[in-house]
């Protein structure tokens, strides 16, 4: 059956549109069931993240793509003309290629981002839970996960951070070989600090302290991550606990000065402290780098790392694209092989039916007292005539049409030339 993809992502639509077509996790199975029960698709998987909503479907024919787009608009209450201007579609090989690129991080806002593979796997699992996936998409997604794993394993696509937040956490991991026993003090509660916090949590940080000018905002983030919230004015009392300090506020004046860091390192008995200032203007006085056992990095230091890593990821992406093309070819072979398998099964079933019919005639002949020799003769002739009927008709039609290619194929299939040689 044909495969189609209908999607909207960060390249085609602003967040104001993307949020309107997003699917709530708790309603995903109902949405999938609706899509299938309304006969828009036979199988479906929906990937819905902050940057994309994509519907992967196995359908009766490619004309169903219009039905799927119409269903998406109806489900979310968006007029079809408005929705269509933001949608993109793929079919068959292009659909296979697209899902493999998505799962491998090649279609992401941040090239090579690792989270998307987990999100695609979760979408697949939800579809399985709702019994909305069958042999077509099962095969596609298993092949996709295999290709994405190979891309992750055999290229450097995910080894080099390309966001400020990810770069900051990666730097911390380089300096502290194991951050699972470390405490991080995060100053600010904006999007960048939120991403930093999530990256730290994903990498097993022991404890996070969130400091913000507004305690309520810090508490919201702290509650999400099982962290501790404090006011900016309390930083001096907590700084000595921090192995890692990452700051990103909108303050026009430095929040951490040299003297504060000197007192903290003294209380820490000169255990190393990493400070990463990703604010503009700076949150941490430049003189802090003069303090023994304090290691200060700025946003410019991270940008240089990111630029190098973007280039490295682009090189890795070239190798990844080749792996994806190999994956598309491999999947195509599986599909074609499945078609041949179905044909073989049908052919064998036809032969089995002929055998049973002729065998039944033979048994009746024996019951009626016919000699075994006579029965076997009729059985052999009956089998021969029925088995060669369709090939004989094909050969006559090909001969009448002077279709030499068909005659050559038929002779190879029937083994006629081999018989002459033997």
From Swiss-Prot:
Pfam families: GlutR_dimer, GlutR_N, Shikimate_DH
Active site per the UniProt annotation: 50
Pathway: Porphyrin-containing compound metabolism; protoporphyrin-IX biosynthesis; 5-aminolevulinate from L-glutamyl-tRNA(Glu): step 1/2
Listed EC numbers: 1.2.1.70
Keyword Oxidoreductase on entry: yes
Gene Ontology biological process terms in this record: protoporphyrinogen IX biosynthetic process from glutamate
Parts forming coiled coils: none
Site (Important for activity): 98
Domain of life the protein comes from: Bacteria
Entry keyword set: NADP, Oxidoreductase, Porphyrin biosynthesis
Residues involved in substrate binding: 49-52, 108, 113-115, 119
The keyword Transferase belongs to this UniProt entry's keyword annotation: no
A single MF term (Gene Ontology): glutamyl-tRNA reductase activity
Binding residues for NADP(+): 188-193
Catalytic activity entry: (S)-4-amino-5-oxopentanoate + tRNA(Glu) + NADP(+) = L-glutamyl-tRNA(Glu) + NADPH + H(+)
Record's comment describing the protein's domains: Possesses an unusual extended V-shaped dimeric structure with each monomer consisting of three distinct domains arranged along a curved 'spinal' alpha-helix. The N-terminal catalytic domain specifically recognizes the glutamate moiety of the substrate. The second domain is the NADPH-binding domain, and the third C-terminal domain is responsible for dimerization.
Similarity comment: Belongs to the glutamyl-tRNA reductase family.
Function: Catalyzes the NADPH-dependent reduction of glutamyl-tRNA(Glu) to glutamate 1-semialdehyde (GSA).
Annotated HAMAP family: Glu_tRNA_reductase (MF_00087)
Subunit structure: Homodimer.
Note: During catalysis, the active site Cys acts as a nucleophile attacking the alpha-carbonyl group of tRNA-bound glutamate with the formation of a thioester intermediate between enzyme and glutamate, and the concomitant release of tRNA(Glu). The thioester intermediate is finally reduced by direct hydride transfer from NADPH, to form the product GSA.
The protein's name: Glutamyl-tRNA reductase
Species this chain originates from: Marinomonas sp. (strain MWYL1)
Gene symbol of the encoding locus: hemA
